[in-house]
């Protein structure tokens, strides 16, 4: 197999380095091994490809793309087929813009109303969230573009997200906080899963054997790549050991030096590095093949889809005095600045 032959040729240093990003949005390219880079970007409800100065908050300019309603709206449709259409449309735009991995969808449970990223998540209902996430994934992956199911797991608040500790008994964890991810992994089959910032029961998600090895890979049968949220890697040695494959965004080699020493002194098997490098390469070559094909993209059709999704996601909570639907000949007043 091509990937195995490449891994055999690579130095240990290069294999370790491959598993960290080259910059904010790309993996490392190694011409001497025939390894291209992979470009990824945010995209739960629309592509956000930054070609110049990159930043996590999206403050700098991005290439134009269709802005679909966020998951908080599309969940109101209760329509997996609609989410599959949106996923497919974002996948087509990703191909047209040279993006091999879309960082979405988000499947975290809405627990805290103060969570600033609730708009990225579908629902308080883990079953609904899982079904819609799976549909989005199927739609995008059918275009040959990878997806990243996030943020795994129990990342339901933003306050102190880098240091917080989600303490959960096993039943609560599995019945509520893991259910959406389990459905999405088994039914959607995403190319990647993104691990979250916080600790889960005292262990950082990027270091968690229980989460990444025992549950995700062994119980659920996930065979894809695990990527960190940006800056979420805690212990790179333990990350390799438990199957946390790609550390993003990269840019620093201090963790790589620790891994190199750990392999040399025998505390980390080199096979752990090989396994992660293999999963990174599999995704890189899949994306390269997809992006080598010409991609046509009908943005007007996507705008129409976005409008339909917004309408289908709108939910009427109260119709006081039967005012809706509006009478055809009635007059209305629109007041205020536009």
Can you say where each PLM-predicted feature lies in the sequence?
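Glycoside hydrolase catalytic-domain context in secreted enzymes
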Residues: 1-338
């Amino acid at each position: 197999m091509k990937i195995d032959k490449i891994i055999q040729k690579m130095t240990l240093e290069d294999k370790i380095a491959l598993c960290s990003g080259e910059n904010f949005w790309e993996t490392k390219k190694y011409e001497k091994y025939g390894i291209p880079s992979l470009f990824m970007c945010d995209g739960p409800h629309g592509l956000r490809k930054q070609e110049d100065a990159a930043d996590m908050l999206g403050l700098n300019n991005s290439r134009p793309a269709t802005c679909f309603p966020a998951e908080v709206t599309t969940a109101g449709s209760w329509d997996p087929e609609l989410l599959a259409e949106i996923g497919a449309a974002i996948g087509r735009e990703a191909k047209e813009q040279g993006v091999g991995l879309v960082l979405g969808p988000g499947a975290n449970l809405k627990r805290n109303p103060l969570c600033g990223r609730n708009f990225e998540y579908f629902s308080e209902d883990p079953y609904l969230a899982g079904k819609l996430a799976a549909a989005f994934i199927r739609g995008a992956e059918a275009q040959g573009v990878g997806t990243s199911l996030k943020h795994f797991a129990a990342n339901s608040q933003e306050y102190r997200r880098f240091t917080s500790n989600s303490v959960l008994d096993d039943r609560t964890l599995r019945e509520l906080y893991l259910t959406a991810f389990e459905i999405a992994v088994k039914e959607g089959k995403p190319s990647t899963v993104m691990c979250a910032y916080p600790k889960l029961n005292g262990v950082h998600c990027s270091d968690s054997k229980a989460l990444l090895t025992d549950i995700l890979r062994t119980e659920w049968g996930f065979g894809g790549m695990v990527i960190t949220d940006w800056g979420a890697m805690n212990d790179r040695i333990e990350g390799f050991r438990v199957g946390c494959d790609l550390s993003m965004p990269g840019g620093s080699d201090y963790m790589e030096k620790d891994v190199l020493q750990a392999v040399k002194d025998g505390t980390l098997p080199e096979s752990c590095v090989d396994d992660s490098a293999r999963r990174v390469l599999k995704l890189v070559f899949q994306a390269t093949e997809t992006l080598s094909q010409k991609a046509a993209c009908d943005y007007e059709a996507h705008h129409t889809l976005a409008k339909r999704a917004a309408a289908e996601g709108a939910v009427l909570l109260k119709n006081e005095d039967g005012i809706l639907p509006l009478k055809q000949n009635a007059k209305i007043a629109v007041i205020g600045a536009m």
